[in-house]
Amino acid sequence: IFAANKVAYSTKRKKADQSPYETLESGLASCTGLSILLISACRSVGVPARFVGTPLWSDGSGNHSWVEIWDGEWKFTGAAEPTGEALNQGWFVDRAAGARSGDPRHAIFAATWRESGLHFPLVWLPENRSVRALDVSERYLKKSATIPEGLARVRFRVRVGELRFSAAVRVIDPSGTVTFEGFSKDERFDGNDHLTALLPLRSRYEVRVEGADPVSIAVERDEQLVELELALLPALHGAVEQGGLEALLRSELGRLPLGKGDAQPLLQLLVEQQGKRLTAERKAEHEARQLEWGGVRMPFWSQSFSAAPPGRRSLWISMHGGGGAPAAVNDQQWENQKRLYTLEEGVYVAPRAPTDTWNLWHQDHIDPLFSRLIENMVLFEGVDPDRVYILGYSAGGDGVYQLAPRMADQLAAAGMMAGHPNETQPDGLRNIGFALHMGADDSAYNRNQIAAQWKERLAKLAAEDKGGYAHQVVIHAGKGHWMDREERAALPWMARFKRVPDPEKLIWLQDDVVHRRYYWLAVDEPKAGTRITAVVEGQNIRIEGAKEAGVLRVRLRDGLVDLDRPVAVYRDGLKVHSGKLSRTAEVMSRCLLERYDPQAVYTAEIVTGAP
C-alpha cells in the first residue's frame, strides 16, 4: 500500500503518531506512522492487526515499531520494510531476539484493548499511559539465528552530512582480499537498519567507499557500528549513476545545499548523464527522421551548411505553407520549403506538418514536437541551443506568429513570411528578434493590413520597453503572396541574434496552447490568457499579473542573482520570500528532465502560492 499511495519512510515526517490521513497527505512517515497506516488498511478489509514495538533495543541503538496480523496466530511484518506475503521476517529479527521480557525499556510490547496491567511506552509522549499493552517479548526471543562463536555482527552506515546514503561498501583484510561487500542503507530504511557483516572478533580490516576516506577498524564486539562520511558531490555522482536524474527528485540527497563551486561540475555531470540516456533512447527516431508525440507523427528533412564546431551550430526550423488541402498539396509545399532558403552556416530543417488542416503549425502537438526536435538536434547534430531560429511561409508564417511568442524561451529569433496571426499577440516577443515580411498586395484575409498594424505595434512596444522587441518589418511594394524571395533578407538579420536564457525582464502571455515553463518562471497549472510580467532588479524580483497563476515557481541561478546573498520576491506587490536560497541538485535535475536544454538549467527555486 505504501508505493500505491506514494508514501515513504522518513524521519522528516511532521510527527511520530500521524493518523493515516496525515501520512497520506504528506507522503512521509516514520516506522510508527507507517505501522498505523498498515494497521488501518488491514482492519478496513477485515484482517486483525495490532501495533507492536520496543522503546529501546537492548543494545541501545534506538527504538522501532512494526505490525502483527492474525493468521491463525499472531505473526509480524515490518511496516518501514514490508516483506510482501512472507511473515515473521525483517531486518530487526536479530535485534528483537535481544529483548528483555519484563523490562519496561527493552521489552517488546503489543497494543491491546484488554485490561492488561501494562501500558505501551510511547517514546514520543512518555507521560501518556493510556494505551494498554501486552509483553510479547518471549515470542521474538526464538526468531534469531545463532551467531557462531568467535564472530560478531558489524554494522555499516554511510552518511552525507546528516543523511544516510546507499553506497557500495567493501571490507578488505590486511592481505588485500575483499572479505565482504554490499550496499549501505539510505533514508528509505528504518534508522536502525544497517548493512551487516559477520566478521571474526579481534580481526582488522580496511573499509572503503568510493569518494570517502578509507576507515581502519578492529572488530571488538558484537553489534559494532562503523560510520563513513561521504562528500556531497561524490554522493550525488553515485546516486545519478545508480538511478539517473530521477533519483535526485526522490531523495533528501537532492535537496542538500550545494556550494557555488560544486554547482558547475554537477551540472556537467547531469548534462552528460541525461545526454547519454536520451541519445540511446532517441537514436532510432532521429535516424528515421520522424518524431512522435501523443500519437501524432512529424517527419522532417534536414541539410547542413558549412558546419561550425560541435556545440556551436545554428538550427533553422522552416515551416511550409498549404493547409486545409489534400495531403498531396501539402506534400508539394513541403518539397518547396526544403529548397526555399540556403544558409551560410547551420542545420536547415524542414518538417512536414503532422496534419493537413488549416492550422498546420499552431495546434497543441506542435510545441512539444518542436521542443523534442530542438533537443535531438542538440544531441545528434551539435546544435547550440542558444542559436535556434524558426521561420515559415504562408501557413508556415501563421505558425511563426503563434509559436514565436509562446516558445520564445527556446529561440534566438523568428521570421514570419506571408502569414496571418489569427488571435495571437506580440507580448511574448520581448527577448527575441522578430522579422516580419509581407507583400504589400497580399490582401487575402487582410494579411497586408494586419502586417502594417503589427509594424506599428512592435515599434510602439520597442519604444516603451527599452531593450525589448527587436524587430524587422518589411512590407514589399508591388508584391503579392509570393515575394520573389525578397524575404530572404530576414535570415542574415535573424542570425545576428543569440538567445537570452536569463532575461532581466520577461512577459509571459499564455496563448490557447499553454506552457508550464517560460524562461526562469514555471507554473503547476497553466491557464490560457494569464499575462505575467517579471523583472529582476539586483537581488529583488518583482512579479505582476500572477493573481490567477496559482502556484508559481521562480527559478534562479548565479548570474541572474547572487545566490550567496539574500533574495526578495514580490508577487503582485506582496513580499512572498526574503532570504538566502540553496542551490540543489533536485532543481537542476528537474530542469533537465523537463527539457534537455543545458544552457537553461537553474540551481535554486522559490515556490509561491497565490497571494
Summary of predicted features, one role per range:
Residues 305-311, 358-394, 406-410:
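Gly/Ser-rich "nucleophile elbow"/oxyanion-hole loop immediately N-terminal to the catalytic nucleophile
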Residues 152-161, 169-171:
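A short, amphipathic beta-strand motif
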Residues 210-235:
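Structured interaction patches on ligand/partner-binding surfaces of diverse proteins
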Residues 186-206, 210-212, 220-222, 559-563:
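Short Pro-Gly-centered beta-turn/loop motif in secreted/extracellular proteins
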Residues 1, 10-22, 26-27, 32-123:
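Hydrophobic/aromatic-rich core segments of domains that either
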Residues 443, 449-451, 455, 461-542, ...:
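C-terminal catalytic histidine-bearing segment of alpha/beta-hydrolase fold enzymes
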